[in-house]
Amino acid sequence: MNHELLKSIIYDQHEVIRNADIVSRPSYTFEADANYVLVGLRRAGKSTLLYKIVRNLIAGGVSWDQIIYINFEDERLSEFRKEDFNDILSVQSELSSAQGYFFFDEIQIVPGWEKFCRRMADARERVYVTGSNASMLSREIATTLGGRYLTKYVTPYNFDEYLTALDIPHDSRALYQTKANGRIRSHCADYLQYGGFPEALRYTARREYISSVYQKILLGDIIARNGIRNDYAIRILMKKLAESVKSEISYTKLHGILKSIGISVGKESIIDYIQYAKDAYLIFSIQNFYARFAERESNPKYYFSDNGLLNLFLDDKNTSLLENAVAVCLTQKYPADVYYLKSPKTGIDIDFYAPSAKQVIQVAYSIQGDAYERETGNLKKFAATVTEPHSYIIVTYEEETTIETPDVKIQVVPLMKFLLTK
């Protein structure tokens, strides 16, 4: 690889980092002497977290010539091969005799990257890697890296970070001030519709920006990466998954839905397509806590990793967006520990259950009319089956009250406050 070209790429990236607008994300912390793999949805803010690390290093006395930042999506690197990795090390030694700090953005584009990163870690170099596909965490790659890297899963802004990025006060005092509360409510409505993609905040035409991100994920991270030929089938499948938010749905049912509208695709292909979408962090699923372990994957509920993505598909928006926002919030707080509850035997039908936090959560746009009995009744049924204390919550769009019965105490919480609860 031409060394002068690599230097040009590195210096250009330095300029990008110097000029970048960076919002602090305190929930992401990094140990000084560790190497990291940052994974997550495309445009979620992984690169910006690396920029922040670089700036902290510079503020601590590290020279820019020690910073080797390479984005492998740069078109000047389209011919880069694993044999060229050594040239990066050579260029670093040409730029500085001091320790180098290596930042590799979207490195999974280069086959064989993991062996190079293992060698770097073995040589006690400081390395930070990002990628937009879960294949970076596959068993084979994890074995190669052998515990030498810590993993951070990066998501679009949560609501707290969203308000921080917009410089909107949202502490407990602001929630009780009429004007401040009104501003937070207004931005919560926007967040519900458009989600938390950091760069989307720069645009008036947010929907168009989010649509372009979706097309990049679908065409690049799913269809092209996995060699899918029946792209129409996967487009319709994603739409049907969006329409099924709030409901559990099996592969067999999805296959039947697609078949009924004239789309010829096998059940095994549907299973593959859904896994590809998960690998690209476009969607995630939760399982029925009551189901036997071997059956939990058979009837999951699917959600989109950002509300803005889900909103691209929906006609009937309100409750679906509300439930999706709660699902995203809960999975950020309690990774791999969020379920739904459904039991034909007891009649229990609960939207979310977080066992470690002992939280039982229903979601309803409003609890007026029939919704009151439906939502509270399910929580009462669950309370009758457990002996340990739990928190019982109904998340609504804007209603707030406390319901106390002889059986259970239920907090009715508006989405705005639920999303801001630490």
Residue ranges and their predicted role:
Residues S135-T151, L166-D167:
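Short regulatory helix/loop adjacent to the ATP-binding pocket of P-loop NTPases
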Residues M1-D21, A32-A34, V39, T48, ...:
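A cross-kingdom feature that marks ATP-driven nucleic-acid transaction machinery
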Residues A98-Y101, A123-Y128:
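Loop/turn-to-beta-strand initiation segments
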Residues G45:
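Conserved glycine(s) of the Walker
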Residues R126-S132, Y153:
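Structural recognition of the conserved hydrophobic beta-strand(s) that form the central parallel beta-sheet
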Residues N2-Y11, D160-V328, V338-P344:
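Interdomain hinge/linker elements that couple catalytic modules in large macromolecular machines
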